[in-house]
Amino acid sequence: MTARPSVSVYSASEDKVVGTCSLPAVFTAPIRHDVVQFVHTNMAKNSRQPYAVNRLSGMKHSTESWGTGRAVARIPRIHGGGTSMSGAGAFGNMCRGGRMFAPTKIFRRWHRKINLHQKRFAVVSALAASSLPALVMSRGHKIENVAEVPLVVEDGVRAYEKTKEAMTFLKTVGAIDDVNRVNDSRQIRAGRGKMRNRRYVARRGPMLVMPDNKGTRAFRNIFGLDLANVNSLNLLHLAPGGHVGRFIIWTKSAFEKLDKIFGTFTEPSTVKSGFMLPAPMLTSTDVTRIMQSEEVRRVLKPKKLQPKRPSRYRQPTNGIRNRRLRLRLNPFQKKEKAMAKGMQNKKNREARHAAKVVRLAKARKNVAKALKKK
């Protein structure tokens, strides 16, 4: 969350700061991606147009089932003879020329109701996310040449009447890179939508927010730049696709109206009845520091020192039954057991016997030599 007390106001014609304004409290609100995604999904459903197939599609045949006993399916079959269609299955979704399975109806539940407070919370979260450069860049916006986020400009941009002046303004504040990104991303849509007046798709660029609907004439024909009124901010524009972090350019007068529209953490909004900014549950996420602070330790009771209980483990005393005690009393027993195990192996026994025979032969030979010398 943003923690700056003030934001710089930039000139519309020159690359310089012309003033400052306090940061609205809405930019320090908690960011809830799950709430934004949920509200966006349900809001997007409210602009759908009902559609359905013809009620009689696939049912315009004179048919009758042949019944059982003919070793064929019991699907209704077309009457008549003398044509390739006679006797062909009809009506079913598995048949040629038949209806679809579960034909679509126009009385489907197309629209969704959303809690008013939930919609306001989602808008607040989207605005708070737009003040973090990391989230704005992760959404794909080109803001490397932008001086500051959130970007606030003077109200002189509302006096522009020519698109040429608007393009010069975008170059001055460094937002032209994001507009060019939108132009470069324009391509033909994949699928049937290209035949239904939705031929092209493109990314979303910056959004210019103004205090009212005046002064939009110079900007409305720039492809890649969206315009919005601060009094009617829409979540579908603040977080396209349900992804927070839209690059927003604010005019100074629109930026200063945010505290009145959304209120603060202590004062309710003067526009939205009964709405106050949702306060974060934790101002510090360092739980260890909180638990070790003097304020918390002063309230908690001192730690009780429990007497040390004797261990339930009893030292073994029977060396015959306990192997560990037996090895501790007689360490040679482990080697002795390994030697006994080696004696049980037939190959080892034969090898030792052969070695013993060789040793005895050498000993007899040495004894014979000693007797000859005498």
From Swiss-Prot:
Sorted UniProt keywords: Ribonucleoprotein, Ribosomal protein
Keyword Electron transport: no
InterPro entries: Ribos_uL4_C_dom, Ribosomal_uL4, Ribosomal_uL4_dom_sf, Ribosomal_uL4_euk/arc_CS, Ribosomal_uL4_euk/arch
GO molecular function, a single term: structural constituent of ribosome
Example of a GO cellular component annotation carried by this entry: ribonucleoprotein complex
Disordered, as annotated region: 336-355
An individual GO BP term: translation
A Pfam family of this chain: Ribos_L4_asso_C
Domain of life: Eukaryota
Protein family according to the UniProt entry: Belongs to the universal ribosomal protein uL4 family.
Record's protein name: Large ribosomal subunit protein uL4
Organism: Trypanosoma brucei brucei
Gene that encodes the chain: RPL4
